[in-house]
A protein has these predicted regions:
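Active-site-proximal cap/loop segments of hydrolase catalytic domains
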Residues: 466, 479-677
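Hydrophobic beta-strand positions that form the internal "hydrophobic ladder"
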Residues: 45-48, 94-98, 143-144, 225-228, ...
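Residue-level detector of Asp-centered blade-edge/turn motifs that repeat once per structural unit
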Residues: 43-44, 92-93, 138-139, 223-224, ...
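Non-catalytic accessory segments flanking enzyme active sites
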Residues: 40, 144-147, 172-176, 181-194, ...
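Short loop/turn segments that connect beta-strands within beta-propeller blades
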Residues: 70-74, 115-119, 199-203, 251-255, ...
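Beta-strand-rich domains and repeat architectures in extracellular enzymes and scaffolds
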Residues: 28-64, 190
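Cap/lid segment of the alpha/beta-hydrolase catalytic domain
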Residues: 235-236, 394, 402-524, 531, ...
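A flexible loop/linker signature enriched in serine peptidases of the S9 family
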Residues: 52-65, 79-86, 98-112, 126-132, ...
Length: 677
């Protein structure tokens, strides 16, 4: 053997030994994670400011600071710290950054400006409610934003109050609105989100819009700075008939609103080019469960759909001179592309995302400036980092490695793509397998089928702390995009329109069969879990097969009638998921309810829900748990205090969710929880 060959062999052996010495991820590593969000590139394209998020073990919250980094990867340094800063936005001169900051002990954020040359930070406005949708005027003298303006509800009755010093019970809450609570936000107070402008030098903000209607999203300035374009649904029956917003031009001097669009469907996300052309997103409302979001441009009075042949949802249009940068999901991967001035689509980059830490959903964001795009980049082995790419498609560079210090000390599970053929109709079903660290193809491993929610959503080759922790415990993890998933076209998504659950069950079972065909999955140790829409499908699965050793049903819908009459999104569900109301067609609701099949369940099943969940209300989980107990099925009920639908939105929630799921599976033959500690 030559000296060179010997050296290569020694390096390979040393690397393998080093990998074996690194332990897998553990539950407390949740609190070690960091990720980037909201990268904003300077007008000259040379510097990116972004929010650096950390999962704080002391406060059990996601906290963030603003950092900057040059487009060549140098000069990585903090800009604003200690105030949970968010939403950085460059001034047109590139010398100032507006952002939101939270004072110690306060829930709401205030609008601030950082002067980069001097390092001075000044408050622009301290507001009674948190601002959003920050947008600088083209000349840098004003900032537009939206915020909630309280209204006054007319009292139902005028009643005597308590005498001075008396302690009476709290007054009843009187509700006379259609939308009266929102998951994670509590009861909806009287009032609406309105549009404001304020001088960039500070002062009193000026309210431009009024009335009982919300202004949505981020406003867009016209090039002359005289007007803003916003999205708003200003119909009187908007609460009872969602999904029909229009674009409006708002005169900055007078507040006069002029409607720009008029059709059945949502028009939103306006972006205005240098010549005043408006790019925006829109969808034609056909009352389908899944409706594509398309790109339109409006030049003067005429609006035209761009890329009519592209069968994918488009997101977040942003101008780069006379071209438009967009993002879209394609087969589980989020891509960045340029719509050229000839109406063609040119690819820039892929793997945008990484801000959904728990499960491998899409997400992330990008910004455009100085001939470059800054975006959040993800992969199966890391959450969101900051990356840049040139508008011409060159110069792709990952700028940060926020978790390098952690992942150099841990061994992650490797991810491979898998396809299955559905037993329902032969359609191809896309999925991914996460293999345990130290994987040995000659062994047989237990498998966890993890099902995404939505149901109109998608998983992909993105970082997932939950999947990695299951793999760290010794499981092969299978996650898939059954019919109904987005990023495969409108027809594929609408295969479950008015038919969910249904043949998506067959897609999932065929994917499990494909995983078994890999040769390293133990057919006697199969487990299943999913949340929200995935919880619906998990409950449906155990009502139709006994092939799984145990199941965890997280925040499910169990009875579609009771869900429609208790959930915060009931109006949306009635319009887009069913043709008639429950009392008009009760069978349509019951035949799709997992509760209808609970009498066939034999699989040990744990139910998991947040006690403040109003998206899939806790009463759904209560029904299922009590039905399981009445049927004598081994079962447990885990209720998370203070948690809404986002059980894992707080770091401890993510850690505990995984811990309880692993403990339940361990009870029924899965690997010991200690393997993931």
């Amino acid at each position: 053997m030559s000296l060179r060959s010997l050296l290569v062999l020694l390096v390979v052996v040393a690397s393998a030994a080093s990998a074996q010495e690194r332990p897998p991820l553990g539950l407390m590593d949740v609190f070690e994670l960091e990720y980037a969000s909201d990268p904003q590139i300077a007008p000259d394209g040379e510097t990116v400011v972004y929010r650096r998020n950390r999962l704080d073990v002391r406060t059990d919250r996601v906290r963030g600071d603003l950092w900057t980094i040059h487009a060549d990867g140098s000069g990585h340094q903090p800009l604003v710290t200690g105030v949970d800063a968010a939403s950085p936005r460059w001034a047109p001169d590139g010398l100032r950054v507006a952002y939101l900051a939270r004072d110690e002990g306060e829930d709401r954020r205030h609008l601030m400006i950082r002067y980069l040359e001097t390092g001075a930070t000044v408050p622009v406005a301290r507001l009674p409610s948190a601002p959003g949708g920050i947008a600088w005027s083209p000349d840098g003298t004003q900032i537009a934003f939206t915020r909630f303006v309280e209204g006054q509800a007319e009292p139902l009755a005028s009643l005597p109050g308590p005498p001075e010093g008396a302690e009476w019970a709290a007054a009843p809450r009187v509700i006379e609105t259609t939308i009266y609570r929102r998951d994670g936000g509590g009861y909806v107070e009287p009032g609406h989100r309105q549009l404001f402008v304020v001088s960039a030098e500070g002062g009193t903000p000026r309210q431009l819009t009024v009335g009982p209607h919300d202004v949505d999203g981020t406003p867009a300035w016209t090039p002359d700075g005289r007007a803003l374009v916003v999205s708003s649904d200003r119909r009187e029956d908007a609460d009872l008939d969602p999904g029909d917003s229009e674009l409006y031009r708002v005169d900055v001097a007078t507040g006069t609103m002029t409607v720009l669009t008029d059709r059945r469907g949502a028009d939103a996300s306006p972006a205005i080019g240098p010549d005043g052309t408006i790019a925006y997103l829109g969808s034609d409302d056909r009352r389908l469960g899944y409706q594509l979001t398309n790109l339109y441009v409006r030049d003067g009075e005429a609006a035209e759909r761009v890329l009519p042949a592209l069968d994918r949802d488009l997101q977040d249009p942003a101008w780069a001179d006379d071209e438009i940068v967009v993002a879209y999901d394609d087969q589980g991967t989020t891509r960045l592309a340029v719509v050229t001035d000839r109406g063609e689509l040119r690819q820039l980059a892929e793997n945008l995302g990484g801000t959904s830490i728990g499960r491998p959903y899409g997400g992330g964001s990008f910004s455009v400036g100085g001939g470059r795009v800054a975006f959040t980049l993800t992969a199966p082995d890391h959450p969101a980092d900051v990356a840049v790419v040139d508008i011409d498609g060159g110069g792709l560079r990952r700028l940060t490695d926020l978790n390098g210090d952690l992942f150099q000390q841990r061994t992650l599970g490797e991810v491979e793509e898998i396809w299955a053929e559905s037993s329902a109709d032969g359609r191809r079903v896309h999925g991914w397998v996460v293999r345990p660290p130290g994987f040995d193809r000659n062994r047989r491993y237990p498998l966890v089928l993890e099902i995404h929610g939505g149901p109109f959503a998608n998983y992909g080759p993105r970082f997932s702390m939950e999947a990695q922790l299951y793999a760290a415990a010794g499981y092969v993890v299978l996650y898939t995009n059954p019919r109904g998933s987005t990023s495969y076209g409108e027809a594929f998504g609408n295969l479950i329109d008015r038919a969910y659950p249904g043949q998506d069950y067959d897609d999932l079972m065929s994917s499990v069969d494909a995983a078994l065909d890999l040769g390293y999955v133990d057919p006697d140790r199969l487990y299943v879990t999913g949340g929200s829409g995935g919880g619906v499908l998990t409950a449906w699965i155990v009502g139709h097969t006994d092939r799984f050793a145990a199941a965890v049903v997280a925040k499910p819908v169990i009875n579609w009638t009771s869900w429609l009459l208790t959930a915060d999104s009931y109006v949306f569900g009635a319009k887009y998921w069913f043709d008639r109301l429950p009392w008009e067609d009760p069978d349509a609701y019951w035949k799709r309810s997992p509760l209808a099949h609970v009498g066939k369940v034999t699989t040990p099943t744990m139910v998991l829900v947040g006690e403040e969940d109003v998206r899939t209300p806790v009463s759904e989980s209560e029904q299922y748990y009590q039905a399981l107990r009445l049927e004598g099925v081994p079962s447990a009920f885990v209720r998370v205090p203070g948690a809404s639908h986002g059980i894992a939105s707080r770091p401890s929630g993510l850690m505990r969710k995984v811990g309880y799921i692993l403990a339940w599976f361990e009870r029924y033959g899965g690997p010991a929880l200690a393997a993931a500690e």
